[in-house]
Curated annotation (Swiss-Prot):
This is Aspartate 1-decarboxylase. Belongs to the PanD family. The modification Pyruvic acid (Ser) is found at residue 25. Its cofactor is pyruvate. Disulfide bonds: none annotated. It catalyses: L-aspartate + H(+) = beta-alanine + CO2. The active site is at 25 (schiff-base intermediate with substrate), 58 (proton donor). The keyword Cytoplasm applies. HAMAP family: PanD (MF_00446). Pathway: Cofactor biosynthesis; (R)-pantothenate biosynthesis; beta-alanine from L-aspartate: step 1/1. Binds 1 pyruvoyl group covalently per subunit.
Length: 120
């Protein structure tokens, strides 16, 4: 049996840009992507801490070191500049894989810089 498990989480990142007229997606600083082992075009689930909205989209690479968290297209309607988001990826895993796996959680500072990397 496969279970859908948390793979990685960017915890309480701050929205820095929203562009309703862009094609879609979420731009994420390359440093955050590397730390969380998230890949461009990977599906993500986003949870808005400020208003409770929950939605999904896909990743595009943001400029390294920029602190960018940009919501594009329809996703731009789900959050405002300055809102805090939790961004997660999930993966199907067998019970054997789960026994040895630990998800990554990236904690950030007020500028979306990496503050701490946790493995649970």
């Amino acid at each position: 049996m496969q279970r859908i498990m948390l793979r990685a989480k960017l915890h309480r990142v701050t929205v820095t840009q929203a562009d309703l007229n862009y094609e879609g997606s979420c731009g994420i600083d390359q440093d955050l992507l590397d730390a969380a082992d998230m890949k461009e075009f990977e599906k993500i689930e986003l949870y808005n801490v400020n208003n409770g909205e929950r939605f999904s989209t896909y990743i595009i690479k943001g400029e390294r070191g920029s602190g960018e968290i940009s919501l594009n297209g329809a996703a731009a309607r789900r959050a405002h500049l300055g809102d805090q988001l939790i961004i997660c990826t999930y993966a199907p895993m067998s019970d054997e894989e789960i026994a040895a796996y630990k998800p990554k959680v990236i904690l950030v500072n007020e500028k979306n810089g990496i503050k701490e990397i946790k493995k649970f």
